[in-house]
Curated annotation (Swiss-Prot):
Disulfide bonds: none annotated. Residues 31-43, 141-157, 184-193, 350-380 have a biased composition (Polar residues). Part of the augmin complex composed of 8 subunits. The complex acts on microtubules and interacts with gamma-tubulin in spindles and the phragmoplast. Keywords: Cell cycle, Cell division, Microtubule, Mitosis. One of its GO terms (cellular component) is microtubule. Residues 197-208 have a biased composition (Basic and acidic residues). The keyword Cytoplasm does not apply. This is AUGMIN subunit 8. The gene is AUG8. The lineage of its organism: Eukaryota, Viridiplantae, Streptophyta, Embryophyta, Tracheophyta.
Length: 644
């Protein structure tokens, strides 16, 4: 697991700006063990922080000239320090160093020693977060504002007196930067600027390398490089609340010459909502009360940091290769402090912006979030036991996770070649623009998704409202239909009653005529009986023929008169019989017509309901056609309404 114990450190060259004369260097080796891991036994001692009590190395390690432990990646000249320049700007040595200096003492390349690091390089451009080449020079802060310029760290200030009196040599450059390294730790920057001599270096060494001595990490080790954090926090000029040029990541140098660092602090408020409350709180503390409160032992609780990392670390992107187990030990230190870089003067917007920081869509990808090369520059976090990864050239974006080890090696070497050819600035700018466009694309996607959700909710609300209106209209139509049916029935009953009332007068007249006819018949029958029974026919009756003739003649006259009257009544009776027969036929027809009328009334009610429904549907169809000509298509299709 501890690969750094077997590696050698590449030498660092002094900066041409402050250290023009290249001093002689003596090869030294240094062995670094993890601060938060149990120390593992090594075959030879390691080289501690610069002090006079540095242990000597074995003959096999001394035989390799200009080799040092790769974990620290710095070289110390033996020239005395200059009083006017306590530290030199950080310069990238990945371009100046030959390929042989990057080899180990065993002759193997770094990718053969760090397979997990090389594997993460091959997939760094395939995940949603793109790695940016970080080998660049440190830019000095603009001298426009005197109170915001970077000042040397507290360790440098404390050791300057010992340097000028005891040892006379130039200060070493502050932690050179190479493509294999990310942002340097603040502890490394202060360590490079310390002299070798002095009894106080042993105490600092004890705090810096606790795994070697066996001591515990105290609060002093958390406050070693606080002035550097103060420099970075005070070196950030505050501008207006707008984004302005802060989105273009002005702290990334695009040329070898140093340029002023212009960075607005409004990005902290703009992007502060994307980071966990712990990091936002620490960033505000660093801006108000300096770096003493930013990295103090009381402000950064390990449980809080672990919770923030667990909340900010997303799931790995599908298709990306999981990170090696050797990197998981320092996940919290490298991922939490990404937005708190202070040693290089990078503004908080670089660590907290959605394009590089811990945005919800990008987060900590396995190729970047688990790599210590993009970690923070705070001294309170332990150094990783494995060498940090380096970014891949953007021209190798098409590499897949199934690339072999040889293709990964070719990609890394091609990136170094491109850096030597001067293509790094354009690559950084292209990657930065790509991230800006990707962030804009994510913002648009979010806005479109939110608009679609709002429209979907509005459509559901409109559909529900239309359905409720349709239901109310249907109930109202049913009520109106029932009222119309009742009214039609009442009209038919009134018409039937009027017809029956006209027939009742004739029926009453028929009863009167029948009584008169019966009375006349009774009188005729009684007269005939009287005339027949009163004639004497037997018993020796004698009658006068003349008087009998006259009586018979009078009886015949009466009978003729009665016959004539009967014939007249008979004609009337026949006419009455005909009328009664016709009345019976009419009554029969009336009963049949009443049955048909009932059937027609029932069918009329059904047809009336269908007519009302069709008219309502026609009205709604015309309205929808009119709305289609003015507005977009209807939210609710017509087929959803179950019309009767």
């Amino acid at each position: 697991m501890d690969v750094a114990t077997d590696t050698t450190r590449r030498r660092l060259l002094p900066s041409d700006k402050n250290n023009a004369v290249v001093a002689t260097r003596r090869p030294r080796t240094m062995e670094v063990s993890s601060r938060y891991r149990s120390p593992t036994p090594t075959k030879n001692g390691r080289c501690p922080s610069p002090s006079v009590t540095r242990p000597t190395v074995s003959s096999s390690s001394q035989s390799v000239a200009a080799k040092r432990a790769v974990s620290a990646e710095r070289k110390r000249p033996s020239t005395p320090p200059s009083p006017t320049s306590p530290s030199t700007p950080i310069r990238d040595l990945s371009i100046d160093l030959p390929a042989s200096s990057r080899r180990l003492s065993t002759g193997r390349l770094p990718e053969s020693l760090w397979p997990s690091t090389m594997r993460s390089l091959s997939v760094s451009f395939q995940s949603d977060s793109v790695s940016v080449p970080v080998s660049k020079k440190e830019r000095p802060v603009s001298s426009s504002s005197g109170d915001r310029t970077l000042r040397p760290s507290s360790n440098i200030a404390q050791k300057h007196k010992a340097e000028t009196t005891s040892v006379s040599r130039k200060p070493t450059p502050e932690r050179k930067r190479s493509p294999l390294k990310g942002k340097n730790n603040v502890s490394d920057l202060s360590e490079n600027s310390k002299p070798v001599d002095g009894p106080h270096s042993r105490l600092i060494e004890q705090h810096r390398w606790p795994s070697r001595i066996g001591g515990k990490i105290t609060s002093n080790s958390l406050n070693r490089s606080l002035d550097l954090g103060d420099k970075a926090s005070r070196g950030i000029p505050t501008s207006g609340p707008g984004m302005g040029p802060s989105l273009r990541r002005m702290s990334l140098p695009l040329s070898s010459s140093s340029r002023p660092l212009h960075k607005t602090s409004s990005n902290t408020s703009s992007y502060g909502g994307l980071v966990s409350p712990t990091k936002s709180e620490d960033n505000n503390i660093a801006r108000t009360s300096g770096a003493q409160r930013l990295l103090s032992a009381g402000s950064l609780d390990r449980a809080t940091l672990a919770t923030a990392v667990a909340r900010l670390h997303p799931l790995p992107a599908p298709g990306s290769r999981p990170a090696s187990p050797s990197r998981t030990s320092f996940l919290s230190s490298s991922s939490i402090s990404r937005g708190m870089s202070t040693s290089r003067g990078v503004s908080p917007s670089r660590g907290l912006s959605p394009s590089r920081g811990l945005s919800p869509t990008r987060g900590l990808s396995p190729s970047r979030g688990l790599s210590p090369s993009r970690g923070t520059n705070t001294s309170c976090f332990a150094r990783p036991s494995t060498p940090p990864s380096r970014g891949i050239s953007p021209s190798r974006i098409r590499q897949t996770t199934t690339s072999t080890q040889s293709s990964t090696t070719t990609s890394v070497l091609s990136f170094i070649t491109d850096v030597k050819k001067g293509k790094k600035a354009s690559y950084i700018e292209d990657v930065h623009q790509l991230r800006l466009l990707h962030n804009r694309y994510l913002q648009w996607r979010f806005a479109i998704a939110r608009a679609e959700s709002v429209m979907y909710i509005q459509r559901l609300t409109s559909e529900e409202t239309l359905f409720n209106v349709w239901h109310a209209i249907s109930e109202l139509q049913d009520h109106v239909t029932r009222q119309r049916i009742g009214l039609q029935q009442l009209k038919l009953e009134i018409k039937l009653n009027s017809l029956l009332n006209d027939q009742m007068v004739s029926l009453e007249d028929w009863a009167t005529l029948e009584r008169d006819h019966v009375s006349s018949l009774v009188g005729a029958i009684s007269d005939l009986e009287a005339n027949t029974l009163r004639l004497p026919a037997t018993g020796g009756t004698k009658a006068d023929t003349e008087s009998l003739k006259a009586a018979m003649s009078s009886a015949l006259d009466v009978m003729q008169a009665m016959g004539s009257s009967i014939w007249s009544l008979l004609s009337k009776v026949e006419e009455m019989n005909i009328m009664v027969t016709e009345l019976a036929v009419v009554v029969t027809k009336e009963s049949s017509m009443q049955g048909k009328c009932e059937d027609l009334l029932a069918s009329t009610a059904i047809m009336q309901i269908e007519e009302c429904s069709l008219r309502t549907h026609l009205i709604q169809t015309r309205r929808e056609e009119g709305e289609d000509a003015e507005t977009p298509p209807p939210l609710l299709p017509l087929s959803k309404f179950p019309w009767p």
